[in-house]
Amino acid sequence: MVKYSQEPDNITKSCKARGADLRVHFKNTRETAHAIRKLPLNKAKRYLEDVIAHKQAIPFTRFCRGVGRTAQAKNRHSNGQGRWPAKSAQFVLDLLKNAESNAEVKGLDVDALFISHIQVNQAAKQRRRTYRAHGRINPYMSNPCHIELILSEKEEPVKKEPETQLAAKSKKGASS
């Protein structure tokens, strides 16, 4: 069994999915995962489909040097830097669908699910080579990643009982 970096609070009301050594850029996937963190499942799926169709952008916050600005990213509460990493969005969307299937098998309410945990880790780099002038060879590396996510059902908070008026306390030393 594979170890997740975090276990869900309520195992019976959550489901998990993960992908290892995925051939998709780590940096783009990290930004994609950060954009959908804590979203409800149906909103996250719709958002990623819009990213693939270039209708909404993923705001880039950490790996953003040289990233151009777009109005679509400004709408997502960032400084305007954003892109449309379609391959990363597709990989994360596939994992969300996998986790949704796991939830259906477990008998969870799919409409009440939200992304309680999503994490992207760097995987071992894959090495290739490119041939340069004068007989030189340079590395041509890819940066794959591991993705893990946990979907949980929203728990309704316990409602506080309305306070009833209590009888006033009498003092111990007072005589009646």
UniProtKB/Swiss-Prot annotation:
Q: Does the keyword Ribosomal protein apply?
A: yes
Q: Which CDD domains match?
A: Ribosomal_L22
Sequence ranges of Basic and acidic residues compositional bias: 154-163
Q: Which PROSITE patterns match?
A: RIBOSOMAL_L22
Q: Which GO terms describe its biological process?
A: translation
**GO MF term set:** mRNA binding; structural constituent of ribosome
Q: What's the superkingdom here? A: Eukaryota
Region annotation (Disordered) ranges = 154-176
Q: Which PANTHER family match?
A: 60S RIBOSOMAL PROTEIN L17, LARGE RIBOSOMAL SUBUNIT PROTEIN UL22Z
What protein family is recorded? Belongs to the universal ribosomal protein uL22 family.
Q: What is this protein called?
A: Large ribosomal subunit protein uL22z
